[in-house]
């Protein structure tokens, strides 16, 4: 089945599906179905779902653990396929920064678009946004959680 075109988006230009770092893809209710859909990432249903998407929004919450606090770091960016004249297309990630500068990055073909790949790209975007982020990461450690809130931080010695 061919990928839909931008003109086929019945939900409007701002109704991108959301993919959450919790391991689920969230498809807003459609005009035909009137309900929401959740798809586990890295499953066969995930890769079939990707073949039908024009773009989606990846959202993740990371926690920098240190100084007795688990501080949340929120991230979101747009992912969309870019067609090629020969062969299958490739996916790219795009993040707009506060200064309105757009940064893009290659993610690879559909069969390589996994949660681990999305997480890795997200960490690279975070490093571009806040250069001290990796300093905090190396000093205190980073944890991101698939489900639920972060655990209580360990007491400092």
Regions found by a protein language model. Name each.
Residues 2-157:
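A positively charged, amphipathic N-terminal helix/segment that binds anionic biomolecules
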């Amino acid at each position: 089945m061919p990928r839909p075109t931008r003109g086929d988006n019945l939900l409007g230009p701002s109704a991108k599906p959301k993919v959450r770092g919790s391991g689920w893809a969230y498809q807003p209710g459609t005009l035909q179905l009137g309900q929401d859909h959740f798809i586990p990432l890295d499953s066969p249903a995930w890769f079939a779902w990707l073949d039908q998407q024009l773009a989606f929004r990846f959202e993740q919450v990371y926690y920098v653990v240190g100084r007795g606090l688990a501080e949340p770091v929120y991230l979101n960016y747009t992912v969309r396929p870019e067609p090629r004249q020969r062969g299958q297309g490739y996916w790219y990630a795009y993040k707009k920064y506060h200064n309105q500068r757009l940064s893009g990055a290659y993610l690879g073909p559909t069969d390589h678009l996994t949660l681990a790949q999305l997480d890795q790209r997200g960490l690279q975007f975070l490093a571009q946004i806040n250069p001290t982020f990796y300093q905090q990461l190396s000093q205190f450690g980073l944890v991101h959680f698939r489900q639920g809130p972060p655990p209580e931080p360990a007491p400092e010695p």
